[in-house]
């Protein structure tokens, strides 16, 4: 099992973690309804890439 040789300071820990945060979600406009939705996800009314995939 790996064990650190020297204690890492709070500053070094923070510098390492500075790239770990999540970015904002990418949004697209649906071609048929003009609705905003997340990329690669079905819209609220059941359309995906211009086709109806979920019947309600």
From Swiss-Prot:
Pfam families: Ribosomal_L32p
Keywords noted in UniProt: Ribonucleoprotein, Ribosomal protein
Recorded GO CC terms: large ribosomal subunit
GO BP: translation
Segments of this protein annotated with the region Disordered: 1-40
Membership in a protein family: Belongs to the bacterial ribosomal protein bL32 family.
Name assigned to this protein: Large ribosomal subunit protein bL32
